């Protein structure tokens, strides 16, 4: 038998969460009186495990925590992100002032812009919300903003100030440049980014 803590990551909702736990315990007591066999109980997700240890019962559901994310800056220090998504620069190109790139001319150069094409797009889980300067990748240790719209199979980034060449490694996220940080840049959460990763990614 199981339930779910609706706001276990938000300590401003501690009273609500504690009431959920009390309700679940009362439910357990009724169930235990009804059945002669042992019933297994679980209620905690990752945030519940970290914030409400007394509610771990028989099992826990460590979802995002298995990827190394805590949903809490204070608790994040105890976890290490384990996922890395990387690609390579497939093409370099220089845009002149007034030239554009991508769907719907999503980026129009107002200065001479050197761009890198990266073969990863929304079919791989990099949502369109990361386009137009919100999202970014890292090339040779430097941050490169995604410009224009995210395409199905590629993104384009500004490498005007980055020394790089075709074939260079591109870090979309890793232990240092985390999925959490990338997700926050577009106003979303790491859950959405990580669970959007397509099967074709190796």
Question: Predicted segments — roles?
Answer:
Residues 2-88, 95-96:
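Active-site loop/helix belt of alpha/beta enzymes
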Residues 94-202:
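C-terminal accessory subdomain/extension
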Residues 72-77, 90, 119-121, 140:
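Short secondary-structure boundary micro-motifs
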Residues 87-89, 144-145:
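Small-residue-enriched segments and motifs
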């Amino acid at each position: 038998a199981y339930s779910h803590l609706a706001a276990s990551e938000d300590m401003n909702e501690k009273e609500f969460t504690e009431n959920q736990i009390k309700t679940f315990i009362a439910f357990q007591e009724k169930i235990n009186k009804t059945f002669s066999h042992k019933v297994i109980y679980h209620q905690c997700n990752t945030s519940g495990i970290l914030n409400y240890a007394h509610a771990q019962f028989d099992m826990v559901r460590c979802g995002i925590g298995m990827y190394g994310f805590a949903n809490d800056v204070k608790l994040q220090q105890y976890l290490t992100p384990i996922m890395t998504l990387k690609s390579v620069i497939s093409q370099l190109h220089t845009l002149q002032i007034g030239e554009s790139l991508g769907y719907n001319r999503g980026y129009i150069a107002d200065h001479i812009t050197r761009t890198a094409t990266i073969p990863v797009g929304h079919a791989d889980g990099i949502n369109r919300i990361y386009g137009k300067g919100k999202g970014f990748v890292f090339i040779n240790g430097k941050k490169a903003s995604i410009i224009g719209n995210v395409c199905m199979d590629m993104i384009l980034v500004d490498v005007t100030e980055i020394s790089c060449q075709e074939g260079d490694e591109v870090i979309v996220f890793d232990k240092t440049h985390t999925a959490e940080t990338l997700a926050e840049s577009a106003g979303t959460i790491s859950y959405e980014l990580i669970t959007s990763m397509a099967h074709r990614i190796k």
